[in-house]
Amino acid sequence: ITTVGLKRLAVATLFACGIVHAQSTVPVMQPTEGDFEARDFHFQSGQTLPTVKLHYATLGTPTRGADGKVNNAVLLLHGTTGTGRAYLTPLMQKELFAAGQPLDASRYYIIMPDGIGRGGSSKPSDALRANFPRYGYNDVVEGHYRLLTEGLKVDHLRLVLGTSMG
């Protein structure tokens, strides 16, 4: 290795250490996670399940207006093959949820559900396999609606934001 090669290696090492340090100093927010069981779930295919588990993660705290209703809820929807945890990377937390950012978790109640068929929500591979009802996007939307209104008692959203099919 030449002197020039050693200098380049030293600069690259310092640069890499700086990136690792910068990423490690981002405060990581711990979400609250939960499951809601939607009872007597009717799929658009005409099939019904006695319960459908809908998994979710939240950041922030719900606040209620004078009418007692949650008034700071935001719904973030993942893409077709993702989960709600897609929004919980250190970079997303820093750019979206940190103090002063667009979805500051100290101001908003951020809800990140797993759609039917994904993550911790009910899906064919849980047990029913081929006997799991045929489901589509309308069923996923119905699941989100029931999670919000029945499970989390949220009937108004400040924002709905998604990636891809979210």
Positions of PLM-derived features:
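Catalytic nucleophile-loop/oxyanion-hole region of alpha/beta-hydrolase
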Residues: 127-140
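N-terminal cap/lid subdomain of alpha/beta-hydrolase-fold enzymes
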Residues: 57-126
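Short beta-strand immediately N-terminal to the catalytic nucleophile in serine-hydrolase-like folds
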Residues: 160-162
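Hydrophobic h-region of N-terminal signal peptides that target proteins for export
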Residues: 13-22
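Active-site loop->helix "elbow" adjoining a glycine-rich segment at hydrolase catalytic centers
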Residues: 164-166
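Catalytic-loop region of hydrolases
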Residues: 22-73, 84-85, 90
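Conserved acidic catalytic loop of the alpha/beta-hydrolase fold
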Residues: 138-158
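Bacterial N-terminal signal peptides that target proteins for export
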Residues: 1-10
